[in-house]
């Protein structure tokens, strides 16, 4: 894991000088040069956001992913609270989607096929012997070099054009992701937009692994979580979603009021 962790998704900021200084070392200890490489004629890089509240977020256009989130606690001590790696090579070697944007469709699609408007679309399976497709296929959005459309003090705008037929999905699809850091508050917003020229399915997601203590030897059971969601999508014994939307009330997934993760045995479901 090379000295990378995870943080509460609450505050980032971008240091403009990071876009120009190849020798930069971030507050989290990352070196920009370790994220600069060429892949099939496209270039990867590291972008650093930071604000006056002491937060720093590092983002790479490889997979439009978060590499680190450094956030201060109530005593001003800063910790990196997301899992990750220290070089672009390590991200390319692993298959766990650390910090990445997942698409076109997060999760599994049963038997790697779906029917839309009466037309069956056969996808390219990548989920072992199951014959399903997982997280949009291989390669997915997490493996792509995203175009950097904007990089200023508090914003990074990235885009990717997924061509018609990529992994079997219909339609040319342009996805734009904007990471925005609050200037006066430790809050990070992720905004996705997508346009397509044909009917298709889309289920984008962000895939960071968090431990907001900053200590990855500790369990997350005692950490508090709040999720403003009334329903969830259950999955079957094949780990494919059933298509239902069920209420979270009375389940371990009910975080409408903040409570510790271990309180309802969420980690065991």
Q: Where do the protein language model's features map onto the residues?
A:
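Sec-dependent N-terminal signal peptides
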Residues: 7-14
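Extended, loop-rich substrate-binding clefts of extracytoplasmic carbohydrate-active enzymes
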Residues: 25-52, 120, 124-185
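C-terminal motif of bacterial Sec signal peptides marking the signal peptidase cleavage site
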Residues: 16-18
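Acidic, contiguous internal or C-terminal segments within carbohydrate-active enzymes
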Residues: 48-51, 55-61, 161-217
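Active-site loop/turn microenvironments that scaffold catalytic and metal-binding pockets
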Residues: 77-141, 239-249, 253-255, 260
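Beta-strand-rich N-terminal accessory domains
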Residues: 36-85, 104-106, 110-125
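Conserved small/polar residues in nucleotide/adenosyl-binding loops
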Residues: 267-269
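Bacterial N-terminal signal peptides that target proteins for export
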Residues: 1-7
């Amino acid at each position: 894991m090379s000295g990378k962790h995870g943080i509460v998704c609450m505050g980032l900021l971008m240091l403009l000088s990071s876009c120009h200084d190849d020798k930069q070392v971030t507050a989290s200890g990352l070196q920009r040069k370790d994220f600069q490489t060429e892949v099939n004629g496209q270039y990867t890089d590291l972008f650093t956001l930071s604000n006056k509240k002491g937060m720093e977020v590092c983002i790479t256009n490889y997979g439009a992913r978060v590499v680190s989130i450094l956030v201060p606690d109530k005593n001003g001590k800063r910790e990196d609270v997301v899992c990750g790696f220290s070089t672009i090579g390590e991200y390319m070697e692993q298959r766990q989607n650390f910090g990445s944007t997942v698409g076109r469709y997060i999760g599994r699609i049963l038997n790697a096929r779906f029917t839309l408007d009466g037309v069956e679309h056969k996808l390219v399976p990548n989920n072992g012997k199951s014959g399903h497709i997982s997280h949009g296929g291989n390669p997915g959005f997490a493996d792509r070099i995203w175009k950097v459309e904007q990089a200023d003090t508090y914003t990074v705008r990235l885009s990717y054009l997924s061509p018609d037929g990529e992994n079997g999905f219909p339609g040319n699809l342009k996805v734009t992701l904007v990471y925005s850091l609050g200037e006066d508050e430790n809050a990070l917003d992720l905004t996705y937009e997508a346009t397509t020229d044909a009917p298709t399915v889309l289920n984008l997601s962000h895939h960071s692994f968090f431990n907001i203590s900053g200590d990855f030897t500790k369990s997350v059971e005692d950490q508090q979580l709040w999720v403003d969601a009334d329903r969830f999508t259950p999955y079957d014994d094949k780990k494919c979603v059933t298509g239902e939307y069920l209420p979270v009330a009375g389940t371990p997934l009910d975080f409408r009021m903040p409570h510790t993760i271990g309180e309802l045995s969420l980690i065991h479901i």
